[in-house]
Amino acid sequence: MSSLGSLPLPVSPDNDPLRDPALYINRELSQLDFNFRVLAQAMDPQVPLLERLRFMCISCTNLDEFFEIRAAAVRHAQEFGLPPAPDGMSPQAILTAIHDRAAELVDQQYRCWNETLRPALMDAGIGVLGRHSWTDRQKRWLRAYFRNEIMPVLSPLGLDPVHPFPKILNKSLNIVVVLKGTDAFGRAGHLAIVRAPRSLPRIIQLPEKLGGPQNFVFLSSVLSTFVDELFPGMEVQGAYQFRVTRNSELVVDEEEVENLALALRDELVDRGYRPAVRLEIAQDMPRDIVRTLLQNFGLTENAVYRIDGPVNLNRIIQLYDLIAQPDLKYPPMTPRTLRDSDGIFETTARQDLLLHHPFDAFTAVLDLIRQAAIDPNVLAIKQTLYRTGKDSLIVDALIQAARNGKDVTVVVELRARFDEEANLGLADRLQEAGVQVVYGVVGYKTHAKMLLIVRREGRKLRRYVHLGTGNYHSGTARAYTDISLITADADIGNDVHLLFQQLSGLASKMKLKRLLQSPFTLHTGILGRIERETRIAAAGRPARIIAKMNALNEPQVVRALYAASQAGVQIDLIIRGACTLRPGVPGVSDNIRVRSIVGRFLEHSRVYWFGNDGAPEMYCASADWLERNLLRRVETCFPILDPELAKRVYREVLQNYLDDNLNAWELDADGIYHKRAPAHDEAPHSAQMALMQGL
């Protein structure tokens, strides 16, 4: 492999035409577009019914997170007068466009539910019953259920000078009730708020004797129907559900705090009540009530979304587990397992191991840590943890290793978004077991996926390494596509050793032999390799780049790709989510093709391939080509050195996905995605299906 120093970097003057805002797609709008592609899976009759339901719920969950993080960041940029994005849009213009595009997505989500999935479930013998369709027996049972199970935990709050507008928790279900009459103290009724505690199930299953084994109702329907029982002697003139979404980005000045864990715990207490960014309301909510809510949440009209159904569609995902009909789900997949996982050290000493999850079982990674925990020759284990899931067997193995006398160091990233609380608990648990826990580097999230095992073999110490594109999380390893490399390569082992020195100590920047690392060499390394392909093409020789990742928005990388295309480099980008690069622009990106794959498994692997004048380089990484990953995180990018394994990655992860004509969406120069379909002379090909069938 070429050394980094031999790769000159492109230099762009300020007046570079490749900075033209017209050449860039807005990142927020591109991210929203991904959710339309997910929702399209919910509309596909070829997908099993409950999986379609799951895809709809995923699109809703994604939209929630989009507002909590991305839209909140744009609103922050607007408030502080930050400059336009590379696409030239001002924060205000972005917010307006977000509202219009998100409103379209919400409309499609509810039409998908009301007009497609709900009737299809009914045809399959699964009833999700609206309150106007309840029989008298069902209504009597639900009234009793309300009185016995729901009413005791509700605390309705009247709105008057003594009872100001209550604090409303982020994404919680609430009912605003319009009242007429006077209460026991002679107070005139007007408005009240009923908050539904999260302890209550959002979907209630009716007994089989009331019409069948698989009939369900929404909690919101039950609350709206029987809310009058909370206000005896008052007349309920209307009950309208609403849900507010709040900014959920934690703000901790890491350079000022003395104890990051303590500061995060304090922030988590207030996260559910931070500034509002979106208000979802019942379709028939009167204008005067809408104005009251907007005033109390500090929002304007472009934050309002009227919905035709329950305000939290993603809670319908509960049906996926409640309904016992395997024929309505994807058939189970049995992943490949290593033939000799018991001797994983001996196997790895002979040759590198490459795993393509979920088609290859994640148990091989777990077995590696378990064996290290009990192997008397293992002296030390070092690992990074970003997301692990509940009841992690990997964490159990690390604790066992510490109790067995191994020197165990774990870098726990406390700021993993929405896993902060779980990771704080994880850090406490590891420390109690004697594990040395560090929290990474101030100002940089540790997103790298690294495991280092130091083992005595005869008179020498040998390093075994696992590097991955995905988290040490058994759950996501079954649902996400990722690459794992297990190797005993001495250079890689030393590089990983140096990285852990940086993370756990105060070591200076060190030169790595094999790995590229954010925030130091990965950005320049990618730019340098793109520039090398540009020079090769300019010399009249074939040049090509293929890269697969989750998202692309780093402006220097985009400009370098444009320049490479202008020189004649053939570029294929497989980007699941947001992409700010505009392909197919005449004279700029004619030679760039962008596609997104959306299928059964979430595409999560990051793979970069450079033709290198006939001596190709293959890399896998924890990083996307995003500003945050390349410049503000600790990330690793590792080479696949074994030629046969590199060919396998090319075949399975790159060419296989470029051949997909069933789950692929192709991006055009106008920023619009088009679903790929087999041509009349093409055989249908699904990349994920081919991998499940063993290619």
PLM segments and residue spans:
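N-terminal localization/anchoring segments of enzymes in phospholipid and broader phosphate metabolism
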Residues: 1-545, 554, 563, 567, ...
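Hydrophobic alpha/beta core scaffold segments
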Residues: 570-574
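Polyanion-binding catalytic cores of nucleic-acid enzymes and NTP/SAM-utilizing transferases
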Residues: 557
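Cofactor-pocket helix-loop regions in the catalytic cores of large enzyme subunits
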Residues: 550
